[in-house]
From Swiss-Prot:
Keyword field: ATP-binding, Cell inner membrane, Cell membrane, Cytochrome c-type biogenesis, Membrane, Nucleotide-binding, Translocase, Transport
Organism expressing this protein natively: Cupriavidus metallidurans (strain ATCC 43123 / DSM 2839 / NBRC 102507 / CH34) (Ralstonia metallidurans)
SMART domains, per the entry: AAA
Biological function: Part of the ABC transporter complex CcmAB involved in the biogenesis of c-type cytochromes; once thought to export heme, this seems not to be the case, but its exact role is uncertain. Responsible for energy coupling to the transport system.
Keyword Membrane: yes
One Pfam family this sequence matches: ABC_tran
Cell compartment(s), UniProt: Cell inner membrane
Entry keyword annotation includes Cell inner membrane: yes
Family, similarity comment: Belongs to the ABC transporter superfamily. CcmA exporter (TC 3.A.1.107) family.
Protein name: Cytochrome c biogenesis ATP-binding export protein CcmA 1
GO BP of this protein: cytochrome complex assembly
Domain ABC transporter: from-to ranges: 6-207
GO molecular function, one term: ABC-type heme transporter activity
PROSITE patterns per the UniProt record, alphabetical: ABC_TRANSPORTER_1 (PS00211), ABC_TRANSPORTER_2 (PS50893), CCMA (PS51243)
């Protein structure tokens, strides 16, 4: 039996004084994708932030390789990519410099050639020197997702990664996630857009 890498044990989450979810338990092994569904305000983002270690659960625990996150915070962050609602890149920098700066902050040694290759894969090679503010929302989202190509991390936590993507972009994202799974990677995501995913588990919030 494959040992779980990420475990949520009897998790509860709150926002303000409102209880968003309670008694959530699941385990993720290499190669799995967990899809989180629910209405707006049901706690999907709170759950993802809790799994990433950015929010403290109201109850329960999150384990990585069988140990609590608080006991291995630095190691866990080196194995995680968290892509939130926001794009997370600077409007005044171009896409190339944005990704180089983001990689440096994340502690990922990448070359300019690697970043250019990632931008080419997401269809932004010709726009790599444009100020980020001049790109469309879909192009900005693709630039943000290009980080997944640069960071060799086991776990991807993606909050609405298909936002602003067209049909081509959504199909590319589904293929990218499938490749990550085939290499033993793990994914936790929320998405309002249907993606062609090999989903192993589903969590329904507010059910």
């Amino acid at each position: 039996m494959t040992r779980p890498m990420l475990e949520a044990l009897d998790l509860a989450g709150v926002r303000g004084e409102r209880r968003l979810f309670d008694h959530l338990t699941f385990r993720i092994v290499p190669g799995e994708c967990l899809s989180v569904h629910g209405e707006n305000g049901s706690g999907k983002t709170t759950l993802l932030r809790t799994l990433a270690g950015f929010a403290t659960p109201a109850a329960g625990r999150v384990l990585w390789k069988g140990k609590p996150l608080r006991n291995q915070w630095s190691e866990y962050q080196r194995e995680l990519v968290y892509n939130g609602h926001g794009i997370g890149l600077k409007e005044d920098l171009n896409a190339l410099d944005n990704l180089l700066a983001a990689a440096a902050i994340a502690g990922e040694p990448v070359t300019t050639e690697c970043v250019e290759s990632a931008l080419d894969e997401v269809g932004l090679a010709e726009h790599r020197h444009l100020p980020f503010r001049m790109l469309s929302q879909g192009q900005k989202r693709r630039a943000s997702l290009a980080r997944l190509l640069l960071y060799r991390r086991k776990l991807w936590i993606l909050d609405e990664p298909s936002t602003a993507l067209d049909q081509f972009g959504a199909r590319w994202l589904g293929e990218l996630i499938h490749r990550h799974q085939s290499r033993g990677g793990m994914v936790v995501l929320t998405s309002h857009q249907e993606l062609a995913l090999k989903t192993s588990q589903t969590v329904r919030m507010g059910a």
